[in-house]
A protein has these predicted regions:
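Basic- and hydrophobic-enriched, low-structure N-terminal and domain-boundary segments
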Residues: 1-68
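P-loop NTPase motor domains
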Residues: 21-41, 104, 108-112, 127-297
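Short helix/loop capping segments that flank catalytic or ligand/cofactor-binding pockets
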Residues: 47, 57-59, 76, 105, ...
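Short, flexible loop motifs at catalytic/binding sites
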Residues: 50, 54-73, 86, 91, ...
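Conserved beta-strand position immediately N-terminal to the Walker
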Residues: 65, 94, 248
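Walker A/P-loop NTP-binding active-site region of P-loop NTPases
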Residues: 73-132, 169
Length: 297
């Protein structure tokens, strides 16, 4: 007995049927890269993606990715799949800011260095550190450090820095850059901001005026140096990093449930990671910011 078609017959014009027959699957974006899975919206073809290739071929204007969705839809699984295949197959270098501590099994599988930070701990990273980025000149380094500190202090103070505070902060960083200190720290900045001098900002007249204008800054830095977040960013970097390895994970799970602390730690840790990303030469690099909302304050 011949099998019967379960669906009712349908009659249509060739103008419509040509889009459905012969059955075909879309080729996707037409670029190579990491195989991410099956594209269920385009006939079941495979879907591959590589932000570097997409940028090189003009599909995107910058190689950034945003993975968004409701809880439980697979955002983290998608990110981990992309990282695992990018590093394991394509030899990319990866730096991950991990607020939940959920990338540790992936780090073990790929041989990534794990840096675990927690208040009162012995492991420290210096957000002002240039890392291996020795190609950056002093002026550019001061600019990067200033941008990071403005974001960090703004988050602590819950306001934008006043123009005079911003100016004195930049002056303090320039003083440190010209002083010959190899690796200035947040403690060095706090020391200068506690007793600023008029030569740090030539447009001012007295040291006392400056000290009054920036009196909140040393106390704001104190949150990272000697109060609730001490032991994370209050000294030179003492982490052994294999610069020729596949990458690293910064485990921030110790402060994940403290929204204010997580924002500060993410800003500081991300600034440190960006110095690594800017180093010329070597493999193509990927920076992953899980829970990136924390950077928005």
């Amino acid at each position: 007995m011949r099998p019967q078609l379960a669906l009712a017959r349908h009659r249509a014009t060739t103008a419509h049927l040509c889009s459905a027959y012969p059955f075909a699957a879309e080729l996707g974006l037409g670029i190579g890269g990491v195989h991410m899975g099956t594209n269920l919206l385009t006939g079941g073809g495979g879907f591959a993606f590589d932000p570097f290739e997409a940028y090189a071929q003009g599909f995107v204007t910058n190689p950034n990715m945003l993975i968004a969705g409701e809880p439980g839809v697979g955002k983290s699984a998608t990110a981990k799949t992309f990282i695992h295949r990018s590093v394991g197959v394509f030899g990319r270098w990866v730096a991950i800011a991990d607020p939940k501590g959920e990338y540790l099994p992936l780090a073990e599988a790929l041989g990534l260095t794990v840096v675990k930070l927690h208040p009162g701990g012995a492991t420290r990273i210096n957000p002002l550190d240039a890392g291996p980025a020795t190609h950056v000149d002093a002026a550019e380094q001061v600019r990067r450090q200033s941008e990071m500190l403005v974001a960090l202090l703004g988050s602590v103070l819950k306001r934008d820095l006043a123009p005079v505070e911003d100016a004195v902060l930049g002056g303090a960083l320039r003083v440190l850059a010209s002083s010959g200190v190899a690796h200035p720290t947040l403690a060095d900045v706090a020391h200068l901001m506690a007793a600023p001098t008029a030569d740090m900002v030539p447009t001012t007249t007295t040291d006392a005026d400056l000290a009054k204008a920036v009196e909140s800054i040393p106390f704001a830095l104190g949150k990272l140096l000697d109060r609730s977040l001490r032991g994370m960013f209050d000294g030179p970097t003492n982490v052994g990093i294999d610069w020729h390895g596949p990458g690293l994970v910064i485990d921030l799970s110790a402060v994940h449930h403290d929204h204010e602390a997580l924002t500060l730690v993410m800003v500081a840790a991300t600034a440190w990671l960006q110095t690594l990303m800017a180093t010329p030469g070597g493999p193509r690099r990927i920076q992953v910011l899980d829970e990136a909302w924390a950077l928005l304050g």
